[in-house]
Amino acid sequence: MDEGILARLITFTEDVVLCIVLNDGRKMITNGKKILAGKIEGELASFILSASKEFLEDKKVGVKKFKDYDIYFERIDINKFLKSIGGEFVKNTITVSELLELIKKEDVIIVDTRSPREFKEETLPGAINIPLFLDDEHALIGKTYKQESREKAIEIATDIVEKSLKRILNEAKKLDRDKLIVVFCARGGMRSQTMALILQLLGFKVKRLIGGFKAFKHAVDK
């Protein structure tokens, strides 16, 4: 399962259906009521949305045909999915509910690794901002991803991180080493993973928020 799908799945709290157009690899995630993620549109999207309902009710896996398309459907049990993810992806991670409980019980430093613009718009209560990418850098990476390729965007991001290490390290020096640090980004993806690695190498106790800011918003806005 690719990182993009993983990043989306870990933001949900209820079972969803993963749908893949086998002809071209396009993906969509739905809860049977609306499209939660994916770029499929038109009649095909409407068919997938309607067909996905039976996989939430009865079937778990199956393939359906719509015109010239073969679509794979798989119900994802979110609770089992989160428990089953292993290895480095979930090492030293924390869920939203665990973070909320942790805040009540002990001192914790919450670090928002998103861009300054994202941080100013909205963040977690009490969070401080140590951005992996500054506003113009974040915009450049996003533009490159959309207009050129994922590989080129990653190449640019890697170069930026290398040049930004001094800035990040200077900010990290201000953190209290006796406190647990929880880092997050938009979806719990590359930015928070990278920042967590940097802080761990510096000897800090670090946990990464699963699902990032989106998961937190979803939980508190229910």
Swiss-Prot record:
**What name is this protein filed under?**
Uncharacterized protein MJ0052
Task: Write down the SMART domains for this protein, in alphabetical order.
Answer: RHOD
* Ranges for domain Rhodanese: 104-221
Which organism encodes this protein?
A: Methanocaldococcus jannaschii (strain ATCC 43067 / DSM 2661 / JAL-1 / JCM 10045 / NBRC 100440) (Methanococcus jannaschii)
Q: Name one GO molecular function term.
A: tRNA 2-selenouridine synthase activity
GO biological process terms, semicolon-separated? tRNA wobble uridine modification
InterPro entries named among the record's database cross-references: Arch_SelU_Nterm, Rhodanese-like_dom, Rhodanese-like_dom_sf, SelU
